[in-house]
């Protein structure tokens, strides 16, 4: 596993994932477990392959390889301020990530 700012050297991690062009199973944003490719350039979440935009994205840092929708993926913020201050986005925490999310924000 390549160690970078996104992966932190881990194969999987609880992350904030926001679809800038639509939704993720009914919501704009979710917090959940993501997995990383060996190179760390791709993120796998809810049967989606999200490739690093490499500076090509307008609103996101990743894009869906199949639909080309842009995504913003980042680490979970302890203050709970994961969304952009100027946006009103409903965020849901995946059931299997709730325990790890609580651990992160209470560190």
Enumerate the predicted regions with their spans.
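Mixed-charge, low-complexity intrinsically disordered regions
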Residues: 1-33, 42, 47-107
């Amino acid at each position: 596993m390549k160690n970078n700012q996104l992966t932190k050297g881990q194969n999987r991690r609880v992350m904030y994932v926001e679809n800038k062009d639509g939704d993720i199973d009914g919501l704009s944003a979710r917090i959940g477990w993501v997995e990383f490719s060996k190179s760390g350039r791709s993120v796998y979440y809810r049967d989606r392959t999200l490739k690093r935009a490499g500076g090509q994205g307008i609103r996101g840092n990743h894009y869906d390889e199949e639909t080309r929708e842009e995504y913003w993926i980042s680490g979970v913020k302890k203050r709970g301020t994961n969304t952009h201050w100027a946006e009103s986005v409903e965020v849901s925490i995946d059931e299997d990530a709730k325990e790890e999310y609580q651990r992160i924000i209470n560190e």
